[in-house]
Structure formats: C-alpha cells, structure tokens
C-alpha cells in the first residue's frame, strides 16, 4: 500500500516539476534549464545522503554491474530535456498521457523479454489488452473531448 501512495506522490510531483521546468526553459534555454535541474537534483541527493547516515560508500559505484546501469543519470538528463520539450510543444496533459503510455508499453516489453536483468514474465493477454486500451485511449484525438454533449 505504501508503494502505491509513493507512486501517486511521484506522479503528482513529476507533473508539477515538468511545468516548472518548462517555464524556466521559456526564460532561459532548454539545455541550461536541464542542466540546472540535474545540478539541483545532485545537490539534494548529496545532502540527503549526508543527512540519512551515508548508507553506501561512494566507491561502491565502481562495483555496479553491469556498468551500463550507471547510465541512469545520463538518461535522466535526456528525460528532463524531452519532458520540457514536449510540455512546451503540446502542453502538460497531452505530454503526461503520451509519456505514461509509452512508459507502460516499454515497462511491459522489458518484463516480457526480461531485458536489463529483470526477471522475464510470461505473456498475458489481459496485460496486452490493457496496454492496447491505454494506447487507444490516447490515440483518440484530444479535440473530440470538446464535442461532448455533457459540459462540466
């Protein structure tokens, strides 16, 4: 249950962060904004590491295997860039829908094929149908929502 709550908090924070980052980009540049996001995240993480008792030695990073797992930070820089770009291009709601939909599809494929050391999971029609329903849901043109007979 705590995992679900933390995931919900993460989703809410990501939505707010994306809007903040997009606004900073409008006033600076996308790479400067992305760099600031990464640097500020680094500072927060280092402070948290010091405050919480420094669990894990810095040298333990050299023992991470496989080494490509250390690319998470570099991927984070491109995530920051692409989120900022998409929010500026198509807005926060559309961006979130596409981002989350692709995350679900990719996560399912990673599990299905056992990529990156994740335990391989068997194919399940219900998961495939669920993914298809999500993709179909975002494929419906956004403008159709304005044609609704019920206006709230």
Over which residues does each language-model region extend?
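Hydrophobic transmembrane alpha-helices of multi-pass small-molecule transport proteins
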Residues: 123-143
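Membrane-interface helix-cap regions at the ends of transmembrane helices
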Residues: 42-64, 112-116, 139-143
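Conserved small/polar residues in nucleotide/adenosyl-binding loops
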Residues: 150-152
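Structural motif at transmembrane-helix junctions in multi-pass transporters
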Residues: 26-30, 82-98
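Loop-to-transmembrane-helix transition segments
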Residues: 3-8, 59-78, 126
């Amino acid at each position: 249950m705590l995992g679900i709550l933390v995931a919900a908090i993460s989703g809410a924070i990501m939505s707010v962060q994306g809007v903040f980052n997009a606004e900073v980009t409008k006033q600076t540049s996308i790479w400067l904004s992305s760099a600031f996001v990464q640097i500020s995240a680094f500072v927060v993480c280092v402070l948290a590491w010091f405050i919480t008792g420094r669990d894990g030695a810095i040298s333990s990073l050299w023992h991470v295997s496989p080494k490509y797992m250390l690319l998470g930070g570099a991927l984070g820089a491109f995530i920051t860039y692409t989120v900022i770009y998409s929010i500026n291009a198509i807005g926060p709601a559309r961006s979130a829908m596409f981002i989350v939909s692709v995350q679900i599809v990719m996560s399912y494929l990673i599990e299905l094929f056992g990529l990156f050391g994740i335990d391989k999971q068997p194919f399940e029609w219900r998961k495939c149908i669920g993914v298809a329903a999500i993709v179909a849901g975002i494929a419906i043109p956004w403008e159709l929502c304005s044609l609704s007979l019920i206006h709230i």
